Amino acid sequence: MLKTILPTIMLIPLAWLTSNNMVWINTTLYSFAISLTSLHLLHQPLDNSLNLSPEFFLDSLSTPLLILTIWLLPLMLIASQSHLSSGSTFQKKSYITTIILLQVSLIMTFAATDLILLYIMFETTLIPTMIIITRWGNQLERLNAGSYFLFYTLVGSLPLLVTLMLIQNTLGSLNLMMLPYLAKSINNLWSTNMLWLTCIMAFMVKMPLYGLHLWLPKAHVEAPIAGSMVLAAILLKLGGYGMLRITILLDPLTTHMYYPFLMLSLWGMVMTSSICLRQTDMKSLIAYSSVSHMALVIIAIMLQTPWSFMGALALMIAHGLTSSMLFCLANSNYERIHSRTMILARGLQTLLPLMATWWLLASLINMAPPPTINLIGELLIITTSFSWSNLTIFPMGLNVLITTMYTLHMMTTTQRGKTSHHAKSIKPSFTRENTLMTLHLLPLLLLSLNPNIIL
């Protein structure tokens, strides 16, 4: 793991010591080199001692999420260049440093061996994310969004710390590799369901569960492009990863406690998809669609079958890349017309035909057609939920229908129709942007052709 963590940390002195005109090129190239060298981690042989240490370990669950995190760093740097082009050199280097610190804390979260270390790094990700939102956001409302993000996350997470300390005293260890063997001895000791709630709620807020999701649209809308990308692609997946890890401990209790959360997720999935139909703001629409997709992941994790876990992992990876790509496309529109309102971006297909192709591909993948990895994830989850209860097919089917409707609505509103007057003298699409979209699409294409890479 140090082969990944140390080179990532060394990007910070690289950013500060590089000459001003080379800072973006050097950091992007070196971070891309790190992401390429980390791909060998996907090969997980049975004798996996190379990826084990007392502090860090990798398995088939954490590796895909870890590689997604590392892959996204150069993409965030490529996407942010235009946003910071008018800023001072100090601002640019501070921004890059904040992103790299966030990256390191995310890598350590996904690789943590101990639940306490996982909790500490889980909370550490909050600080750089909030700095990115409140310092480099566009509107004044970013301060409000930052405080929402901070308080929702902290209020959800603090009971988890107390519970983990209690479990540590009861079991004597919080090592993730020991938990399956230790958990059997504590079933009779847990007479209350509050422990289950405190353990799960921190991750439910991060997912977010419908009803606890109000921080997400605010944070997405006010964050700069790198903030939106990392929020959608990775920070939401921290909640899913934490739930997958901690349900090993809570196994017998989950089957008694999951009904309200399953109902809320099924209802919230349809509701947030319906909210998307009423959105005029591009970033807000993509943010609400993230809540809808993550509700599917919550359902999968609660049902606790091998198929549902595979579906949850596939959908998390697929959604991470798809939503990040959609945010990049929304940002490319915003940089040209200086508005996130969809109706003001109408008719861009005639002005930016290549960008319209990226919009079409991203919209299609968001709708999960065959043979994409999105469809594989959704099919696994829908099949599992149908075997749990036949009635779930109605909200699931309705969600698929509404998802198609709002995605097509977003696509046609921004690309078709008569071009608005202020959009006629816009800049053409840059090679930087086309490279960015290609780097989002390549992993999706690879995973669609061979899902066994992560499943």
UniProtKB/Swiss-Prot annotation:
Swiss-Prot/TrEMBL keywords: Electron transport, Extinct organism protein, Membrane, Mitochondrion, Mitochondrion inner membrane, NAD, Respiratory chain, Translocase, Transmembrane, Transmembrane helix, Transport, Ubiquinone
At the top of the EC hierarchy, this enzyme's class is translocase
Q: What is its EC number?
A: 7.1.1.2
- What GO annotations for molecular function exist for this entry? NADH dehydrogenase (ubiquinone) activity; ubiquinone binding
- InterPro entries registered for this protein in UniProt: NADH4_N (IPR000260), NADH_Q_OxRdtase_chainM/4 (IPR010227), NADH_UbQ_OxRdtase (IPR003918), ND/Mrp_TM (IPR001750)
Report which reactions are catalysed by this protein.
Answer: a ubiquinone + NADH + 5 H(+)(in) = a ubiquinol + NAD(+) + 4 H(+)(out)
Specify the protein name.
NADH-ubiquinone oxidoreductase chain 4
**Gene Ontology biological process terms, A to Z:** electron transport coupled proton transport; mitochondrial electron transport, NADH to ubiquinone; mitochondrial respiratory chain complex I assembly
What is the documented function of this protein? Answer: Core subunit of the mitochondrial membrane respiratory chain NADH dehydrogenase (Complex I) which catalyzes electron transfer from NADH through the respiratory chain, using ubiquinone as an electron acceptor. Essential for the catalytic activity and assembly of complex I.
Spell out the GO cellular component terms annotated for this protein, sorted alphabetically and separated by semicolons: mitochondrial inner membrane
The reply on keyword Methyltransferase is: no
The record's comment on protein family reads: Belongs to the complex I subunit 4 family.
Family annotation (NCBIfam families): NDH_I_M (TIGR01972)
One Pfam family hit: Proton_antipo_M
Q: What does the subunit section of this Swiss-Prot or TrEMBL entry state?
A: Core subunit of respiratory chain NADH dehydrogenase (Complex I) which is composed of 45 different subunits.
What membrane topology is given?
Multi-pass membrane protein
